[in-house]
């Protein structure tokens, strides 16, 4: 798939969510079923030779393609949510933000020991959220076999923060 076609459908919103940020909005892709299917097809092609037990999606935009991908691969979808959002027993991981910190959580029974996990989120920036998700997966005994992102902000070098967890990292669009 030509990434330029996808990139044409990423809307840049200046000064959102705060001044100085150029937000990469994926909703134009979501409103185009043909493009959404091409995203899933591209991810499946990348994962073709991998043994996958589950897809982990990070709240909230990681749920969108994560669930579609899990269904296409016929494997479970596992949500990682902001702390306090899951109803059963959870484990929590805190991570740094440019303006403070945040916490994410996963159900303690979500991953079986030894499962091969793909972590998906819509955007890779500094890698903080993906690292926190990785730590949660590992604490439950899962193996991270790949990271998948729709968009990567390469200038922030977040990819380097993920290399301790998996060398298999795919971003469809890089800025």
Please report, for each region that a protein language model flagged, where it lies by residue.
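Conserved G/P- and acidic residue-centered "switch" motifs that form tight phosphate/ATP-binding loops
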Residues: 122, 127
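Short glycine-rich phosphate-binding loop at a beta-alpha junction
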Residues: 52-59
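Residue-level signature of catalytic and energy-coupling elements of molecular machines
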Residues: 20, 55, 77, 147
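PRPP-dependent phosphoribosyltransferase catalytic core
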Residues: 6-8, 131-175
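Short Gly/Thr/Asp-enriched flexible loops that form oxyanion-binding sites at enzyme active sites
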Residues: 64-73
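Active-site-facing substrate-recognition patch
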Residues: 1-52
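Conserved acidic residues
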Residues: 53, 115, 145
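Short, glycine/charge-rich flexible loops or terminal/linker lids adjacent to PRPP-binding catalytic cores
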Residues: 75-118
């Amino acid at each position: 798939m030509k990434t330029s076609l996808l990139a044409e459908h990423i809307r840049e919103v200046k000064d959102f969510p705060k001044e100085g940020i150029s937000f990469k909005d994926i909703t134009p892709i979501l409103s185009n079923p043909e493009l959404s299917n091409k995203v899933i097809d591209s991810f499946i092609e990348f994962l073709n030779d991998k043994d996958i037990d589950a897809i982990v999606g990070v709240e909230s935009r990681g749920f969108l393609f994560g669930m579609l991908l899990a269904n296409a691969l016929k494997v479970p979808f596992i949500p990682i949510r902001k702390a306090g959002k899951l109803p059963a027993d959870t484990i929590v991981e805190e991570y740094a933000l440019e303006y403070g910190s945040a916490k994410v959580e996963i159900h303690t029974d979500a991953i079986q020991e030894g499962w091969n996990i793909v972590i998906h989120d819509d955007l890779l920036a500094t890698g903080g959220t993906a690292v926190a998700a990785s730590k949660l997966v590992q604490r439950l005994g899962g193996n991270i076999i790949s990271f998948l992102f729709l968009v990567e902000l390469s200038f922030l070098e977040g990819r380097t923060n993920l290399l301790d967890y998996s060398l298999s990292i795919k971003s469809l669009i890089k800025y």
